Amino acid sequence: MNYTPNPIDTSAVSLESELMQLVEYMAKNNHDVWAKERIAQGWKYGPCRRDDLKEHPCLVPYELLPEEEKIYDRNSAMETLKAVCALGYTILPSPDTK
């Protein structure tokens, strides 16, 4: 199989500073979705990753993740929001969040 990834070009998109809280919410949610899926597959917390025992050190609340893992989740969230903007959508907070 010959596969060439072709992601949406987000290089010209910069997110407003007001969206950084949304980035953090989305990063936490991404982690929670990932963790819930792993737990449903029988994985549990372990101090180091052991695929044979289904143990993973990141099966902890987002707040307890090492900073490099949080950065990974934040970057994923930022790229998603930037792709939404690059596709011509506008992200606005609901009136309840102001």
PLM-predicted stretches and their roles:
Residues 1-98:
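Alpha-helical propensity feature that highlights long, continuous alpha-helices across diverse contexts
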